[in-house]
């Protein structure tokens, strides 16, 4: 698929989803089953409005069935499922209608809170609709088929995805709301993060831990918190706080490295460096608030990391405990303002060299 976009100065190629692959393979197999004609390509429409022409692979057939595959192309997105072949076996069945099942390498949902009910194959609603719509285009009137989607290698690849955390076992999910993979899509990551919250909420949890990365997650686990209650949100703290309110959570522990959380102290809730990288400026402003001289402020402004800035601040005679507490208090205040005081929030501020350097907010009892 040779369609591109430009992001952060880089030319990136679009791909197509496992849902598009499943729909295309199902349409191709159905067409070949009823016409007896072998085809090399198949055309489908996607919810995004793009028309795809995809290569049909590994065609096999027998009495009353045809099976074929479509290779997943994730474009320039870092997608674990890129290169997998999504197969569809289409069999004649008595009566009319289309029945869709999951086979080898397609996960099974085990927990509530997902778009698919527990016990069902992890074929999301939009891909399921795509499969049905594309097959109907080539299914003769009055005929019925049984469709089985399979993904050889899917069970192994699924371990590299969110599925284990989401309670989807045995394989990958057949996904895609648009049919198209947008490279480096923020929306795809946000959707995955929201699913984690959705599952915890469906299980009755009211308390959750948010960590921007591994430092916060590792710290929370050392504190004895259950790993599945810890969500690594990356850069999307604002989004996750909003969703925590939406899903009825009452308590959030925010545990993270000062390099991420100092941005939150200044009211920055998307902490990606391309959105806002003002760490040095924020710390310089705060150390000036603590009475540091211009030389110290300049050194902090020139620092490469927040850890280096802390060293500079400490050498200048500023009480690091008080300074860190000031930051933690502001993180807490900004988060409370962001959710209009609808969550109880506890902040744990971490330094690589110093460990936990400050806590603020309401103590969350587990």
Swiss-Prot record:
Gene Ontology biological-process entries: anaerobic cobalamin biosynthetic process; methylation
Catalytic activity as recorded in UniProt: Co-precorrin-5B + S-adenosyl-L-methionine = Co-precorrin-6A + S-adenosyl-L-homocysteine
EC number: 2.1.1.195
Pathway: Cofactor biosynthesis; adenosylcobalamin biosynthesis; cob(II)yrinate a,c-diamide from sirohydrochlorin (anaerobic route): step 6/10
Keyword tags: Cobalamin biosynthesis, Methyltransferase, S-adenosyl-L-methionine, Transferase
An MF annotation (GO) of this entry: cobalt-precorrin-5B C1-methyltransferase activity
Keyword flag S-adenosyl-L-methionine: yes
Transmembrane annotation, as ranges: none
Pfam families (alphabetical): CbiD
HAMAP family found in the cross-reference section: CbiD (MF_00787)
The family this protein is said to belong to: Belongs to the CbiD family.
Protein name: Cobalt-precorrin-5B C(1)-methyltransferase
């Amino acid at each position: 698929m040779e369609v591109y976009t430009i992001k952060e100065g880089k030319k990136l190629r679009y791909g197509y989803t496992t849902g598009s692959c499943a729909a295309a393979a199902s349409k191709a197999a159905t067409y070949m089953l009823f016409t007896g004609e072998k085809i090399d390509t198949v055309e489908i429409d996607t919810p995004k409005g793009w028309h795809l022409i995809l290569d049909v692979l590994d065609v096999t057939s027998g009495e009353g069935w045809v099976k074929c595959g479509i290779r997943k192309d994730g474009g320039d997105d870092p997608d674990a499922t890129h290169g997998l072949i999504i197969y569809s076996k289409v069999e004649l069945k008595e009566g009319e209608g289309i029945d869709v099942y999951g086979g080898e390498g397609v996960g099974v949902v085990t927990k509530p809170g997902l778009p698919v009910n527990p016990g069902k194959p992890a074929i999301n609603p939009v891909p399921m609709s795509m499969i049905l719509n594309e097959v109907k285009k080539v299914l003769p009137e009055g005929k019925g088929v049984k469709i089985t989607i399979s993904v050889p290698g899917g069970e192994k690849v699924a371990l590299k995805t969110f599925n284990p955390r989401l309670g989807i076992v045995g394989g990958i999910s057949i996904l895609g709301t648009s049919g198209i993979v947008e490279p480096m899509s923020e929306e795809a990551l946000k959707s995955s993060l929201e699913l984690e919250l959705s599952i915890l909420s469906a299980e009755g949890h009211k308390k959750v831990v948010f960590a921007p990365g591994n430092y916060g997650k590792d710290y929370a686990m050392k504190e004895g918190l259950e790993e599945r209650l810890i969500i690594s949100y990356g850069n999307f703290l604002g989004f996750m706080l909003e969703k925590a309110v939406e899903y009825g959570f009452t308590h959030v522990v925010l545990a993270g490295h000062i390099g991420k959380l100092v941005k939150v102290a200044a009211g920055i809730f998307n902490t990606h460096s391309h959105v806002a990288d003002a760490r040095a400026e924020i710390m310089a402003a705060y150390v000036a608030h603590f009475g540091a001289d211009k030389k110290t402020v300049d050194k902090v402004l020139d620092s490469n990391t927040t850890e280096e800035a802390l060293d500079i601040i400490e050498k200048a005679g500023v009480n690091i405990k008080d300074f860190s507490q000031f930051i933690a208090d502001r993180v807490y205040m900004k988060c409370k303002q962001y959710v209009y005081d609808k969550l109880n929030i506890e902040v744990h501020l971490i330094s690589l060299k110093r460990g936990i350097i400050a806590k603020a907010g309401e103590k969350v009892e587990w």
